[in-house]
């Protein structure tokens, strides 16, 4: 009978853990150990290696320095780098690259009312403008007819025109001015302050003949 009861009673599965009375920690619930942190390499100190963190910090510092410049400062930096490239290549620096720096230094050093002229600094013969820097024939006379024709002669040093066109129009504009200026002192100084007009002379001559 006892054997039949034991056979009829359900047997516990063999895979279930069984508590042993000899175990001193029996029945004690313990927390599982946390898994090691995953290194993301974001420089946040969460499991990343020190070398990766240093690289990220260095790149972040470089990006911060790059963004610390304003737009105008960035443009000026690129301008100076371009000038340095001309120096490194041994080529002459174009005038339109030097002119902004010259204006900036001169205005900050001498003030707006004491701006030194280019002739005083020995640069009077240079044409500091973008049009002259882009001139295809800088040594050619600039006299044109307003269309396609242009004088083919060389310019006079320090001028924009050749010997033929450098004095063009000066004599004609000065002749009537010089003639009137020379006639005025002669009329004022000959009669002791009395000026005789041609009309008065003719009237006096006609009156004398009538008498």
Swiss-Prot record:
Keyword Transcription carried by entry: yes
Positions of the UniProt region annotated as Disordered: 1-32, 167-190
GO (cellular component) term, any one: nucleus
Motif interval(s): Bipartite nuclear localization signal: 140-150, 168-175
Predominant location: nucleus
Superkingdom in the source lineage: Eukaryota
UniProtKB keywords: Activator, Nucleus, Transcription, Transcription regulation
Similarity remark: Belongs to the GRF family.
Task of the protein: Transcription activator that plays a regulatory role in gibberellin-induced stem elongation.
Entry's free-text remark on domains: The QLQ domain and WRC domain may be involved in protein-protein interaction and DNA-binding, respectively.
Name of the protein described by the UniProt record: Growth-regulating factor 10
Organism whose genome encodes this protein: Oryza sativa subsp. japonica (Rice)
Organism ancestry: Eukaryota, Viridiplantae, Streptophyta, Embryophyta, Tracheophyta
